[in-house]
Amino acid sequence: MANSDSPEQNENHCSAINSSIPLTPGSLPTLTLSGKIRVTVTFFLFLLSTIFNTSFLLKLQNWTQRKEKRKKLSRMKLLLKHLTLANLLETLIVMPLDGMWNITVQWYAGELLCKVLSYLKLFSMYAPAFMMVVISLDRSLAITKPLAVKSNSKLGQFMIGLAWLLSSIFAGPQLYIFGMIHLADDSGQTEGFSQCVTHCSFPQWWHQAFYNFFTFSCLFIIPLLIMVICNAKIIFTLTRVLHQDPHKLQLNQSKNNIPRARLRTLKMTVAFATSFTVCWTPYYVLGIWYWFDPDMVNRVSDPVNHFFFLFAFLNPCFDPLIYGYFSL
């Protein structure tokens, strides 16, 4: 999540930024065995996701080159292209950043990169989530209002552009709230400890709570609700049509490519929603738990914490497998 520090932690660290506090070896975070395993798994998933998403983009590029030059990408393939780009962006920013930060424990890259990388991290998390919403909305409209979608060829491009724009805007506060803190002991004989955090950026604790809730809602709750509603509308519409005319069911079993394609994209959309839910739920459950109960860190084992957070990195690995299986 964007920031998950408790009010007590925020107040204590703010008072320590401009003063020296005693640092002991046991008071600072270190790279544990479970942390090393997390780093190893993170970079392994980074390689997998990079290979999978890049391969799909190359396959899509080869497909377009075989077509007539005047022919544009189909609506669905255009959506998949941007989802792949969003997943690749998340892979190239979030995974290496998480892996390297777990290795170094503290932040060595300075104030500017602290802000810029914090912005890019959240931007690259918003983009795939919003692209999933765009695909769900597009597929829902294609089934429930096919004539309106067919007559408005720019709708898909508009939703794609809006998804990228909102991702860049919603990640904007990261440039302000993140900054460096430096802790040093009284003697000045140690190099101290530096970290890229959000401490002292919120005037009141509830401002921080509101921002956390906003990012949580935009990254997970709202996209999940939209995907569930869109898939429910698709299933309801198809069920109603087939109930009114059972003979239309034969279209899905015929050699006609149009019904088969619609059924395939429906299955793909459901698979996307399932992957999104399975991969991100453990991550956000752990984040929300810590948000309301910071002491849970002392009750939940370190390996369990790392295991839950690694679930989120599976999503950009699964997505190219899903649309590679269903689309090409």
Curated annotation (Swiss-Prot):
Keywords on record: Cell membrane, Disulfide bond, G-protein coupled receptor, Glycoprotein, Membrane, Receptor, Transducer, Transmembrane, Transmembrane helix
Family under the similarity heading: Belongs to the G-protein coupled receptor 1 family.
InterPro entries named in the record: GPCR_Rhodpsn, GPCR_Rhodpsn_7TM, GphnRH_fam_rcpt
Record flagged with keyword Cell membrane: yes
Record has Magnesium as a keyword: no
Gene: GNRHR
Protein name (database record): Gonadotropin-releasing hormone receptor
Carbohydrate-modified residues: 18, 102
PANTHER family in the cross-refs: GONADOTROPIN-RELEASING HORMONE RECEPTOR, NEUROPEPTIDE RECEPTOR-RELATED G-PROTEIN COUPLED RECEPTOR
Gene3D superfamilies the UniProt entry points to: Rhodopsin 7-helix transmembrane proteins
GO molecular function list: gonadotropin-releasing hormone receptor activity
Cytoplasmic side: 59-77, 138-164, 233-281, 327-328
UniProt GO BP: cellular response to hormone stimulus; G protein-coupled receptor signaling pathway
PROSITE patterns hit by this protein: G_PROTEIN_RECEP_F1_1 (PS00237), G_PROTEIN_RECEP_F1_2 (PS50262)
Gene Ontology CC terms, in alphabetical order: plasma membrane
Organism: Bos taurus
Task of the protein: Receptor for gonadotropin releasing hormone (GnRH) that mediates the action of GnRH to stimulate the secretion of the gonadotropic hormones luteinizing hormone (LH) and follicle-stimulating hormone (FSH). This receptor mediates its action by association with G-proteins that activate a phosphatidylinositol-calcium second messenger system.
Chief localisation class: membrane
Disulfide pattern: 114-196
